Structures are given as structure tokens and as C-alpha cells.
Amino acid sequence: MNLLFHTLLFCFFYLTCFIPNFIRLKIKCAAGYNFAFRYFRTSYLPRIIPRFTDAPLILAKDLSMAGNVQEKQLRWYNIALMSFITVWGFGNVVNNYANQGLVVVFSWVFIFALYFTPYALIVGQLGSTFKDGKGGVSTWIKHTMGPGLAYLAAWTYWVVHIPYLAQKPQAILIALGWAMKGDGSLIKEYSVVALQGLTLVLFIFFMWVASRGMKSLKIVGSVAGIAMFVMSLLYVAMAVTAPAITEVHIATTNITWETFIPHIDFTYITTISMLVFAVGGAEKISPYVNQTRNPGKEFPKGMLCLAVMVAVCAILGSLAMGMMFDSRNIPDDLMTNCQYYAFQKLGEYYNMGNTLMVIYAIANTLGQVAALVFSIDAPLKVLLGDADSKYIPASLCRTNASGTPVNGYFLTLVLVAILIMLPTLGIGDMNNLYKWLLNLNSVVMPLRYLWVFVAFIAVVRLAQKYKPEYVFIRNKPLAMTVGIWCFAFTAFACLTGIFPKMEAFTAEWTFQLALNVATPFVLVGLGLIFPLLARKANSK
């Protein structure tokens, strides 16, 4: 059983930590070894985003490097690997295991079979249909439903990052606490108002860093990338050699088939949004469907390979989590502190105390900083970089000498500051606040996936107009049914996800529910105001 335990851990962390980092370099080699060397030296190390906590947040920029690859040169395995580093991260396993325990194994199988696989192949058809479009989802909507809805899609893609930005400084603070104190007690020693105030200060500081332009971004990313890459290799090396050195007791005992069967009730249903949140992001790979050799066959093959890779990673990771943490007695702060607990346990296996955990906490702090800085800058520039003056006021697009959209940054600051401080009125401790923001992300982020399915339904409806190289389902009624199913399932997950995962009808539960309902409407609704402001400005 020790061998099984460490084999699972090794496979999981090898997939999530080492392979994605290596792939970033490997994909680029198609353009020549000289280019690969330059990329490794100047871009690869500076821009590795931590695999333990996030899916890559600047992948759009990474993938743009692949534009140097000659036309039709990408193969199915290139597509699969590029997509894998877009979609997957360690946090996907941690968060869903914390919600469901080992039952999540069944949930992963369901999600991959009936949602993620058709979702990935839908993305393939849309990318093939609009092969010359560079705006992703907004381009798809613009061609099928007009520029007005295309603007709203682009706005949705940006504004859903606001809860993410509000949570990132929390993660930095937690990582610093583990690095300095060796445990998670820092966030318990101060009031939630004081901690969130410090969180806001951290956000303002790193927004200033982001506003300094690409030089500061590269410095932060370089340090973070090297640190997390080293920790990834270290974990893999220690995990694979542990069976010969240590003895490990499995935390979850008496595992049977019944352990994996969910009890379908309202509590279980409210956790589906986190699963949907975990598997999103495949649409970022769509611009490369027509750079694939024989895209009608190889692109769907790559997407199916992606589904298998992610499924294996999710299931092995969940089993490994069950071996480290008792599925029947999940710690209340597992979402908040799981990464540090894992390295702490690894240190215990090797009689190293907290050394590994502290090293990881420091590396993760740098990684979280890089993720925050890039996420402040990149999505906003995507929204404003090709803005239509009919929908976005010119004043919002004004930039400084560094190319920073000043007013766009100010808008981001206002929204994030509200989302950081407002919850302190009704949420009493930092652990619950962290989990609330994470669950809010699982409600808000999938809203952008809805536009993918809207575009697919529109393309199916206009099938005579578009002739893509790759078609997911040629039977029109069946294709329409699949598109409607994916849209409805995503919407259902978002709606049920708004209910807090805690004792119902308490004061804090009611407060969290109110915020979960209001936040998506307010954030998306703000996008309806800017066309009015733009119209007023243009009339003058």
C-alpha cells in the first residue's frame, strides 16, 4: 500500500508540476532549437506560473509564442499538452476534495464524460469556424450575434476576474504566515477587518507594480518561476524515493466502492460549480485549431487526449488526497491550507520538520505575487486593447507612458476594494472568508463559459453559412441538443453554487447568500452602463 500511495502521488504531481513546465519549452521547439534556447533563457523561466495553486494565468501570452510555429505544424499531442497546461492545476483537486471527499472520484468521471469532453470538442469546432479571429469568444459572438453581444461577452470575460483578484492577496498573506510562523495561525491572530485591510494594501502595492510595465512584470515572474520550478522537481524527487525510505499510514481507512458513491442531496448539488470551474479554460486553445496538421482528425484527437489526461490527473490526485487526508473527517481549513499541510507531512516522512513546508511557502508567496500581477494587467488589456468606441468610452482606454490603462486600473481597484472589504461586515473569520471568495469564483468564473455554448448554438443554427474544417457533430438536432445541455448544465452549476457550503439559515449563511446573488448581477450589469457612457461621450 505504501508503494501504491507514493506511486499515485508521484503520478499526480509529475503530471501537474513537472510535465506542464517542460511542455512550455517543448512546444516551441518546432520552430527550431535556436528559438527554443532563446525562449528558455528569456521567457521560459521568467513566466512559469505555480502549478500547485493555479492554472496558468498568462497562457494566452505563452501560446502567442507558438504563432512562430509554421502553419499546419502542430500535431494532436501538441494540442493536448498545450491545452493541459491551460486547464489543469493542483488547486482543482484540493478544492473539490475539500468539498466532497473521495466521492469526488465519481463526480470527476461524470464531469469528464458528460460535460468536459463535449465542451472541449465544441471549442475545437468554434476555433475552426472562425480561424481568422483573434478575439476568441468575443469574435465568435460578434460574427454570429452582432457587436453588442460581443462586447458583453468580452466584458464578462474580464469582469469575472474581479473575485479572483480579490482573493489573490489573501493567498499571499496566508503563504507569508506559513513561511514566517510555520503554521496557519497568522490569520487567526487578528480580526478579519485588520487582515482584509492588509489584503487591500497588498493589492494596491502589487497594482502599482503591475502599472510599472513589462520590466517589473518580468522581474517578479522570473523569481517566481525559478522558485516554483525547483520546488516542483524537489517534490517529485522526494515523492518517488519515499517508499524505500519511509513508512506512510493511509489516512482514509476501509475504502470500499461505497466510499466513492455520492449521496445526491442539495449539499452535493451545490458543490458542482467548483467542478465546472475546475475544468474550464479550453477555449484559450481554439486559435490553434487551424495551425494543426489535418485539423479535422488531429484536433479532436488532441482534445480527447486532453480529457483523458485531466481525468487521470484528477482521479489519481483525489485518491492521493484521500491517502493523506481522512475523507470522512476533512479539516475545515483544507481549502485554505492544504498545500502547506501536504509539504508539512512530506517533511514529517523524512524527519525534516517544517523545512520543506517553509521553503514551499516562500516559493508559493512569490508565485502568488506573479499570478496577481499578471492577472491585474493581462485581462484588462485584452478587454481594452481592441475596444469598440461605441461600447467602451475612450477615457477608459487612456494609457500612460508604460502602456498601462490608468482609468482601467482605477476601475479594477474600486471593484476589488469593495469585494475585499464588504464581506467583513458579515463574515467573522479569515478561513470562512477565503472559502467564500473561492466559492464565489466558482459561481462567477463559469459565466464566461456560457458564451462559448451560446456561440456554438448560433453556429449550429447558421450551419449553412459556416464551413469549418472540423465539425464536432454533423447531425444538427443532436449538435443543438449538446450545446443546450452544456449551457444548461453550466447555468445550473452557477445557480446552485450560490448557496453557501455551511449551516443553513444562520446570519452568516444569509449574508454570504446575499453577496453570492448580488455579485454576479452587479459585475456583469456594470457592463451595461459603459455603452451608455460611450454614447454620451461620442455625441459630444
Residue ranges and their predicted role:
Residues 21, 72, 105-106, 189-194, ...:
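Helix-loop-helix junctions that connect adjacent transmembrane segments
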Residues 176, 196-249, 280, 303-308, ...:
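Membrane-interface loop-to-helix entry segments
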Residues 142, 170-194, 231, 291-295, ...:
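Helix-loop-helix connectors at the membrane interface of multi-pass transporters/channels
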Residues 118-125, 129, 133-199, 208, ...:
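Hydrophobic transmembrane alpha-helices that form the core helical bundles
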Residues 71-79, 195-197, 293-296, 305-310, ...:
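Loop-to-transmembrane helix boundary motifs in multi-pass membrane proteins
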